[in-house]
Structure formats: C-alpha cells, structure tokens
From Swiss-Prot:
Comment on protein domains: Consists of three domains; the N-terminal catalytic domain, the editing domain and the C-terminal C-Ala domain. The editing domain removes incorrectly charged amino acids, while the C-Ala domain, along with tRNA(Ala), serves as a bridge to cooperatively bring together the editing and aminoacylation centers thus stimulating deacylation of misacylated tRNAs.
Gene3D superfamilies the UniProt entry points to: 2.40.30.130, 3.10.310.40, 3.30.54.20, 6.10.250.550, Bira Bifunctional Protein, Domain 2 (3.30.930.10), Threonyl-trna Synthetase, Chain A, domain 2 (3.30.980.10)
Entry's family note: Belongs to the class-II aminoacyl-tRNA synthetase family.
Gene designation: alaS
Cofactor annotation comment: Binds 1 zinc ion per subunit.
Subcellular location per the Swiss-Prot or TrEMBL entry: Cytoplasm
GO cellular component, one term: cytosol
Cofactor dependence: Zn(2+)
Protein name: Alanine--tRNA ligase
PROSITE patterns: AA_TRNA_LIGASE_II_ALA (PS50860)
Pfam families reported for this sequence: DHHA1 (PF02272), tRNA-synt_2c (PF01411), tRNA_SAD (PF07973)
Length: 874
C-alpha cells in the first residue's frame, strides 16, 4: 500500500466504526501557550479530554500534522542519520470521549492491523501496564495473543506511575495506562523485545500506542477514577508505511523516496543513499507545512525554529555541491505527494515557494564565507588535537553569517567535535541588546515619515480601530503590502505599545477588510509615531485602509507582570543591598525581566531570598497600581525615582506600585496581586561594578519552579533517595568517586609497570636501537607516559611508540632514550604515526604526544614504525 492509501484506509476504517473524521489542526497550537508546535494527535482534543470543550461527536479519527523541532521535543540533530527521526511526521489516531474504552479500542486496533492491513499476527507483540489486568486479559483471552507476546511493563525504579506504559497529561489531571503494539522485523535485526535489556535495538518497533484515560490525578498524587474514561491513540504514518511496504527505514517508503529523488535532482546528486538527501526530504515537509500554517522565518520563537530548519537544509545542500537557491524547487514535488491530503499545500504552494526562495537567497549570501571560517577553524583544531569548538567563534558565525548554533554543531559533529555552548550563550547574552538596537530599532529609526502622530490607547484597551497612515517595505514607503511581504505599518490610533524603557514592543494582528497583518514587533519611528513591524499573512493592505488593531493578550499580560515585578524588585534591591543600587539597563518581555544594576559584589543566596520575600509580600498585599501624569518638578517633589542620565519631558508619568514610585511610560498590572508570583532565576556579573538579575513572574515563574522541582525529583530518583536526602547522597557519592579515582590511578600505575615488562620482550633490534610499537588497551595519556618511562628505563637504548583507542579517538605517545635523540626525534616519530590516523602532535626530542581521529588505520601505522626507524638510521 502507498502512504496515501494507508492514511485513507485508516480514516475509512474508523469512519465505518462511527468515528467522525476530523481534519488535522494547525501546526501552531490554538490557545495553548505550553506548546511550541502541535506534536501529537490529541493536542486539538485536549480541552475535550479535560471537559472544557464539547463536540457534537464522541468518537473521532484524524491524521494530524506534527512537528518536533525546538523545545522539549526536538529531533532536529538526529534527522538524516537514523531510520525514524523526523522534524515533521503524521500521527494517525482514533479517539473516544467517554464513549468506548479498552475492549473496543484493542479490538479495533487488532482488526485494522491483521484484517485490513493484513499484518501477520505472529509478527505483533504488545505491552501493557503491569497492573492493567483488564487490558492483559483482553489481549490474551479475547484477541488470543499468546501470553509470551503480551509483556507487562512496570514503573521505573523509585517513581510511582513513571512507566513507558502509563501516560500522564501533567503532574495532575487525566492519566491512565496504555498498551503499545510492536512489529517484529525478524531475528536478522539486532535488538530484543520491549522491557528487555536490548529493547533499544531496531528489531521490535513500536507502531501504535493506545492510551486509556481512566484516572484523574490530584495534587496529592491520588488517582480518582474518571466517570467517563476516554481513549487516545497514535500511530505514526511513516512507521506503519515502512512495515506495510516491507522496508526497515522510514526513508525507504514511497513518500520519502520520491522526495529524496526530488532532492537529488535539484542538487545534481547521484548518491541516493546520502544522509543529506534524507535531511532535505524531511526538512521540506516541516518547512512547507509550517509556512502553510502561517509561520514566517524570523529571529524568535516559532519563526526562528523554522529559520533553523531551512538553514540546516541549505547547509546540507551546500555539502552536496549546491551553490545557489535549490530548496524551494522541492515544494512542487511535496505538493504532488501530499497536496490531495492537505489542500493548504496546494493553495499555498506559490507563497511557500516564495518565502523559501527569499530565505535561501539571504543565506546563500553568507554561507560560503561562514563555511570557510568554520572549515579553517576545524582544520586548526585537527592540528592541535582540540575537540571543543570555540563558543565565541560559533557566536560570530551566528551573529555575522546567520549560522544557527545547531547548524555549526551539526558540521562539528561530523568531525567528532563538540561546541562550547556555554561560551556561545555568554556571547549571545552580551550582544543581544546591541543586536536588537542594530536591527529592528535602527530599521525603524531610518524610515522617513512626515505624517501625523500615533495616538496610543494601550493603557486602557488591547483593541482599537485605526487608519493606515503609511506602509513601508524594504525601508521605503509603498502604497500597499501584498500577501507574504514583510513591512511596517503606521496607524493614527493603536493599542500596541512601542518598545521603550526596556519594555519590548507588542505583538498581535491588524485586521483590515482585505488583509491580515501579523505584528511581530512595535517600534518607534519617531517619538510619537509607532511602526508595527511584521508580515502580511493574507490578502492586501493599503494606505488609508481602516483596520482593527488587536494586541496579543497573553504576550502583553506576561510583559506587564514582568514590568511591574521589575519595579518591585528595584525597590527591594535598594532595601536589601543599599541605596547605592541604581538601574544600569533592563529588558522586559513576556518570558522574563532582566535587570542590570550597580553593585560591587555577587548577590548572595540569602540576599536573593530576602529580595524575593519582599517582592512576593507586595504581591500578596494586592495593592492597586496608580499611574498619574504630572509636571516633572512636581514628580521630583513626590520622591519618584528617576534614572540617572535619562532625558525626561516637561510632563512625566509617575507609577505607584506597592511601595515603589518611579517615572515610567510602560504598561503594568492593575494590582500587585495580578503579578501572581516572583522568582529570581539567575544572578551574574556583566561588567566591573555591575550585576545582572534575571527573574520570572506569574505563570513563567511557576513553570520555572516546576522545572526545578522536576529536576530535583529526577535527580533524587536517579540516586534512589527522597529529595530531602539528595544533598547528603551526592556528597557521599563524590567522596566515593574521589576514593575510586585514587584507587584507579594506583591500579593504572601498577598496570603500566606490568605492561612495560610484557611489552619489552616485543622490541626488535634495528641498528643497535630497540624499536617497539604497541597498543595499550584503554590507556589514557598519563598511563601512556608512565609506561613509556618504564620501557625506556628497561630497554636503555630505544625508540618507542605506544597508542590507545578510546571511542573514535586515538592517543599516541612516542619516546626516544636520551642517547638516541641525535638520530631520531620523538616529535618526528609521533607525527609520522599521527598523520596516518588523521592527526598531528608535538613535544620534546625524547617525548612527544599526538591525537588522531581514524582508529581503523592504527594497526597499519604501528606496523610501519620499524621501517621508518630503519630508514632514519641509513
């Protein structure tokens, strides 16, 4: 069966069982800020399962578009190198909302697999939750699966309900056991059945998961039976297609083979097994569907994930020899494959192609220069044996040449090199504000505008009617913007806050009679003229059009919480650290507040706790916020805090929030209680006498605390102790490690001595010099040196090469006794060997070290040492 036939057969089967066929939801989750992208079939039914949404049906089936790239679920780096990792995939599913339950779900699954898809029953193995006797009995007694092929899977050690066969929506809420169906590819494939030590092999592949939501977990962890149990199932189309088409890799199915051939055509590649072609076949699906669902390449959020995927695809095309835009040429092939099932691909083909072409043209301007720098750096590293790529250089590639970090890491990984991501993050943090100023703000400031000012209504409302006063594209005024075009819109009235005072600009939409403009940022073109930056997602927008301007409520509210929390934190910092504390810079956005301030020492843990206590006490007090506009001299008399060096007008806005009083034009909560919660996330130094605090407020703070609690719980579970005993257990373990390392060093020294005695007998006499070349299994550099010294003492007049292999790395040591260095140099000898194993080294005349990356050539290299010495002695 072809992939399209499999998809349709699945939907038709469940339609015949009374299920409503529901179209795939968008890859951009509607109303769920916890998700970056739709990544499961149940996402669109989440509120139905939770009881918040009622549908006219109780049975549903769908083929859901899913993306896993960025955030918690991120398969990007594995795509192209494994048989089953994808950024985009389709999830086939059937769902019961309080209708049928385990018996029908299991019978449906078995009937579809064995009677419709005609899979041999003896090729299927199933798992159930260890305590789910009901599912076990259905499989063994009703379906007739032999007991040895129905495997009970229990909890992970130390964690109740933490099992591959127990599903939970979150820490609380609907949950329940699941049963998974696996296909056995046969004994010729390595791997064991699920639950066995070899379960990670490729022999048994999960093809279908049936989740039985039968409990509601409360905050104390108690399970309460649901009055109407439900069913949520998921089967990857690509996986079942591989099984039905008799291939082992998803990339061998018809759908991918056609896309791989298309990728080969547009890159003029003849090797159809190239991993890079698989990358292109995968990435064209993710990119095209994301653009079809309204995601535009950008520098933040979903837009940046899309840009990363596009640029990773371009890099793989470049690796195949492409030197000009090619990726967009694959869109038509994708539409041919999937356009009937997903009409949005057909209707959006021209727009998708255009946006991809724009991104390609932009990146091809810099990729060659960037790759040259990257390759040169890697070549230098190979010479020195360094295996960690400089994070500052990685940031330069990102900042100057548009190389996402994972693209650089992808190239490095192919050479056995990792990237110093901590140094990259530090460089990013230092330059982020400068990049913002050099990018969006500079672009706004350079626009020429001579019309009327913008009236801001955003203190009182998040929606307003406005008239388009001006439009800009590529920095120039235009009469209209068309679908897919980036631009700037100026309105006479707006609820959108323009970036100022450290607070980022608002996002949202401008809806006209003929078009919708997605506002990605709002910047001031002039003091009282606001530019709405973004893209026209549909239709046309013209100068003079009336629009409905609507700010993204969730984003604005989060920003307001962070801004108000910043004022309270500033006041608390002065109370705890002293009146010398002055603001040196700030950034307030939906995800955090970042606050730079004058202070000469790191803020201690106790001081951080006291600052948090003060702010959270103000939040609990739930006092109203008061904003007043008054003459600046009157504001000074009230004691309002003013920022040193800031320019103020004759009239200023004074904000009272809690015990804080500052001049501020930003947007804020109505009462301190609206902030919800405050938590300091990090504290660091950014310059002499300047410290930086990053903090979170509201739901962002809550998520941070939950993540920290989960990390603590995971660590405690790993050590098999309650969380309260974790610190003591770690200290105990560190002491044990220290003792074991000491014992290991002693044993290595002893081993070196014994190996030296054994190896000495293998030396051959060449021209009066004893020559030895041998491998020491598992030896590190110190062990090689110690063994070398003992051999030199024992052999007296000698030239020695010792090597070891650890993973894909080769370590080589060359030693020459003092009486021989006039004729043979250790550095020359070690480089002779290292060159054959893909490395280079150096050292003193009597001792030198080297590294290599090709262990397969080591035996030949060692065998050639005697001949090299003989040639040197002639």
């Amino acid at each position: 069966m072809k992939s399209n036939q499999i998809r349709q057969a699945f939907l038709d089967y469940f339609a015949s069982k009374g299920h409503q066929i529901v179209s795939s939801s968008s890859l951009v989750p509607a109303g769920d800020p916890t998700l970056l992208f739709t990544n499961a079939g149940m996402n669109q039914f989440k509120d139905v399962f939770l009881g918040f949404d009622k549908r006219p049906y109780t049975r549903a089936t769908s083929s859901q578009k899913c993306v896993r790239a960025g955030g918690k679920h991120n398969d990007l780096e594995n795509v192209g190198y494994t048989a089953r990792h994808h950024t985009f995939f389709e999830m086939l599913g059937n769902f019961s909302f309080g209708d049928y339950f385990k018996r029908d779900a299991i019978h449906y699954a078995w009937e579809l697999l064995t009677q419709v898809f005609k899979l041999p029953a003896d090729k299927l193995t199933v798992t159930v939750y260890a305590e789910d006797d009901e599912a076990y009995d259905i499989w063994t007694r009703e379906i007739g699966v032999p007991a040895e092929r129905v495997i009970r899977i229990g909890d992970n050690k130390g964690a109740r309900y933490a099992s591959d066969n127990f599903w939970m929506m979150g820490d609380t809420g609907p949950c329940g056991p699941c049963t998974e169906i696996f296909y056995d590819h046969g004994e010729h494939i390595p791997g064991g059945p699920p639950g066995s030590p070899d379960e990670d092999g490729d022999r048994f592949i999960e093809i279908w998961n049936n989740v039985f939501m039968q409990f509601n977990r409360d905050e104390q962890g108690v399970m309460h039976p649901l009055p109407k149990p439900s069913v949520d199932t998921g089967m990857g189309l690509e996986r079942i297609a591989a099984v039905l088409q008799g291939v082992h890799s998803n990339y061998e199915i018809d759908l991918f083979q056609n896309l791989i051939k298309a990728a080969a055509r547009v890159t003029n590649t003849t090797d159809l097994d190239s991993p890079s072609l698989k990358v292109l076949a995968d990435h064209i699906r993710a990119c095209s569907f994301l653009i079809a669902d309204g995601v535009i390449p950008g520098n933040e959020g979903r837009g940046y994930v899309l840009r990363r995927i596009i640029r990773r695809a371009i890099r793989h095309g470049y690796k195949l020899g492409a030197r000009q835009a090619f990726f967009h040429l694959m869109v038509s092939a994708l539409v041919n494959e999937m356009g009937d099932a997903y009409p949005e691909l057909k209707s959006g083909e021209e727009r998708i192609t255009s946006i991809l072409r724009q991104e390609e043209d932009r990146f091809f301007e810099t990729i060659e220069h960037g790759m040259a720098i990257l390759e040169a750096e890697l070549e230098e590293m190979a010479k020195t044996g360094n295996h960690v790529f400089n994070g500052e250089t990685a940031f330069k590639l990102h900042d100057t040449f548009g190389f996402p970090l994972d693209l650089t890491a992808d190239v490095c990984r192919e050479r056995g090199v990792s990237v110093d991501s901590a140094a990259f993050d530090a460089a990013m943090a230092r330059q982020k504000e400068q990049a913002r100023a050099a990018g969006k703000f500079k672009m706004a400031a350079n626009l020429e505008y001579t019309g009327n000012a913008t009236t801001f209504h955003g203190y009182d409302t998040l929606e307003a009617q406005g008239k388009v006063l001006a439009l800009y594209k590529d920095g120039s005024a235009v009469p209209a913007l068309n679908e897919g075009e980036l631009g700037v819109v100026v309105l006479d009235n707006t609820p959108f806050y323009a970036e100022s005072g450290g607070q980022v600009g608002d996002q949202g939409i401008l809806k006209g009679a003929e078009g919708i403009f997605q506002v990605e940022d709002t910047q001031k073109i002039q003091a009282s003229v606001f530019g709405h930056h973004g893209v026209l997602s549909t239709g046309t927008l013209r100068v003079g059009d009336e629009v409905s301007a609507r700010v993204d409520l969730l984003s604005r509210h989060r920003t307001m919480r962070h801004h108000s929390a910043t004022h309270l934190m500033h006041k608390a910092l002065r109370a705890v650290l002293g009146s010398h504390v002055q603001q040196k810079g700030s950034l307030v956005d939906p995800d955090k507040t970042r606050f730079d301030f004058s202070h000469n020492a790191p803020v201690t843990a106790d001081e951080i706790r006291r600052i948090e206590d003060i702010v959270n006490a103000e939040i609990l007090a739930n006092t109203p916020t008061l904003a007043r506009v008054m003459p600046i001299d009157e504001a000074q008399k009230t004691g309002a805090m003013m920022l040193f060096g800031e320019k103020y007008g004759d009239e200023v806005r004074v904000l009272d929030i809690g015990t804080s009083r500052e001049l501020c034009g930003g947007t804020h909560v109505s009462r301190t209680g609206d902030i919800g919660l405050f938590k300091i996330v990090s504290e660091s130094g950014v310059a002499a006498g300047v410290r930086r605090i990053e903090a979170a407020a509201g739901d962002v703070a809550l998520r941070h605390i939950q993540q920290q609690q989960q990390l603590l719980a995971d660590a405690a579970a790993s050590f098999k102790v309650p969380a309260i005993e974790l610190a003591g257990k770690i200290s105990q373990t560190l002491e044990q490690i220290k003792a074991l390392e000491k014992e290991l060093a002693r044993l290595k020294s002893k081993l070196a001595s014994s190996q030296g005695d054994e190896l000495a007998s293998q030396a051959v006499n060449i021209g009066g010099i004893k020559v030895l070349a041998a491998t020491l299994e598992g030896a590190d550099a110190n062990t090689l040196r110690e063994t070398m010294d003992k051999l030199k003492d024992k052999l007296k007049t000698a030239a020695i090469v010792l090597a070891s292999v650890n993973g894909d790395k080769v370590s080589v040591a060359a030693g020459v006794t003092t009486d021989t260095t006039a004729r043979i140099k250790a550095g020359e000898l070690v480089n002779f060997v290292a060159a054959q194993v893909g490395g280079k080294g150096g050292g003193k005349p009597d001792m030198a070290m080297a590294g290599g990356s090709d262990p397969s050539q080591l035996p030949r290299a060692l065998a050639s040492v005697a001949g090299w010495v003989e040639e040197r002695l002639k």
